[in-house]
A protein has these predicted regions:
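Phosphate/dinucleotide-binding and metal-coordinating scaffold of catalytic cores
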Residues: 1-219, 224, 228-305
Length: 305
């Protein structure tokens, strides 16, 4: 079996052999390319057990404990990156089976060997890819649209989304030319032990923007699967921080003072002008929580001098 990136062989799974170093998943490049790191990386790509849409699709066709079978039969194709697996002697090409180019299995018909990208969606809420290329998220998501709009007003790169019946439809931030590498898949941080300083060191100003906007909206769950990089799918280059996405935990805090606020300001002081700018824009938000937390940030900045 081969790990591919589009039509380029990247890693020989059977023989644990690197075939293209530049296109290796970050975790394998940083921690050593072997079947232990390959398996660990694959686990980060799987859907969460709390995603009821993914769990339903998985159960009706594959059962609940059949990851190896799912990987083999769906070729582990995702709608977030261009990695997939195939047999060494299989002549099939990426364009013939990728959800970027071809219809995929969404549970509306019997599974017939297509890609099943919903089975590779992370996060806690119920989510599913639809044939229009958008990720549909269900549940109480009204605040998510407010967060997206606030990011736009602040000039921060962010996902685009439309309101739908019962949820939102999120436009894909990736393409056949740019793929997402979540921070937990990168090998550049410990997903269970990182802090604001780690984010600043990895992403600089863009990382500071994320920390401050999360402080404004009271997002207490920016875990390592909820941010990352965009990578060039031909060269493997890390192009930029990915647009911000997944605001499920906005309003975890509605207080005027907490560690989320004080730590964000503390670690983002190298970018204090940017912090002041974002907080100034957010202080005019219609959402009262966003407004009062932004005002707290402005006061904290002044007190730091």
């Amino acid at each position: 079996m081969l790990l591919m990136c589009k039509n380029t062989p990247v890693y020989d799974i059977d023989n644990e052999k690197i075939l293209n170093t530049n296109l290796l998943p970050g975790l394998m490049e940083q921690k050593g390319a072997n079947n232990h790191t390959f398996t660990k990386w694959m686990k980060y790509r799987y859907s969460s057990g709390t995603n009821t849409m993914a769990r339903k699709l998985k159960g009706i066709t594959f059962g609940q404990g059949a990851r190896m079978r799912i990987n083999r039969e769906t070729r582990a194709l995702s709608f977030s990156d261009c990695y997939w697996i195939k047999a060494t002697d299989d002549p099939i090409r990426f364009e013939e089976i990728s959800p970027y180019y071809k219809p995929f299995w969404d549970g509306n018909e019997a599974f017939a060997g297509q890609a099943a990208p919903t089975l590779y969606v992370g996060g806690a809420l119920s989510k599913a890819w639809k044939q229009d290329g958008k990720l549909y998220k269900y549940g109480d998501i009204s605040v998510e649209l407010q967060c997206i709009e606030l990011c736009r007003k602040c000039g921060i790169s962010v996902e685009n989304a439309d309101e739908t019946d019962g949820g939102i439809a999120i436009y894909n931030i990736t393409s056949p030319m740019l793929m997402l590498e979540q921070a937990d898949q990168s090998g550049r941080l410990d997903p269970d032990d990182f802090d604001e300083q780690t984010i600043i060191e990895l992403f600089g100003k863009a990382g500071a923007q994320m920390l401050i906007i999360d402080a404004v909206i009271g997002n207490g769950d920016r875990h390592a699967g909820n941010f990352g990089w965009l990578r060039n799918t031909d060269t493997g280059e890390y192009v930029s921080m990915a647009p911000l996405y997944d605001f499920d935990h906005a309003l975890d805090s509605t207080l005027e003072s907490d560690r989320l606020l004080t730590d964000a300001v503390k670690f983002c002081m190298p970018y204090k002008d940017e912090v002041r700018r974002i907080a100034g824009v957010a202080a005019e938000a219609e959402n009262e929580v966003f407004k009062k937390r932004s005002q707290s940030i402005l006061r904290l900045i002044e007190c730091s001098f």
